[in-house]
């Protein structure tokens, strides 16, 4: 993973997870396919009883940017707090585990379009 001058990724992407094995691969594939590569992906497993933790471990073996917090079920807010504690990025984003992103989504968000339009006024 490339990092900025401080040694931290530009963006920490938090993914709260609870029993979403059906959607998780598509979600993680979209996170890893981002054109903005300077990210860390923090999966917060909130006590899933399905195959979600095994899927996360599989992705962790494939890509060092994927990390997991594995904790007892305590709800969404607690999951986000754990993720924020671990996040090292300058910015933090959230991707829900049953969603996916276009491959350029984070890059587009990191470089918002700026338009400058000069105004000329003629004095009479």
Outline where the language-model segments fall.
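Nucleotide-sugar donor-binding/catalytic module of glycosyltransferases
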Residues: 1-124
């Amino acid at each position: 993973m490339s990092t900025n001058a401080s040694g931290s990724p530009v963006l920490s992407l938090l993914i709260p997870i609870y029993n979403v094995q059906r959607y998780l691969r598509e979600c993680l594939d979209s996170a890893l396919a981002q054109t903005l590569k300077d990210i860390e992906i923090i999966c917060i497993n909130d006590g899933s009883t399905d195959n979600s933790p095994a899927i996360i471990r599989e992705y962790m073996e494939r890509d060092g940017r994927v990390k997991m917090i594995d904790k007892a079920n305590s709800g969404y807010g607690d999951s986000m707090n754990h993720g924020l504690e671990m996040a090292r990025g300058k910015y933090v984003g959230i991707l829900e585990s049953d969603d996916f992103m276009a491959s350029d989504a984070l890059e587009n968000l990191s470089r918002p379009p700026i338009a400058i339009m000069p105004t000329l006024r003629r004095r009479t």
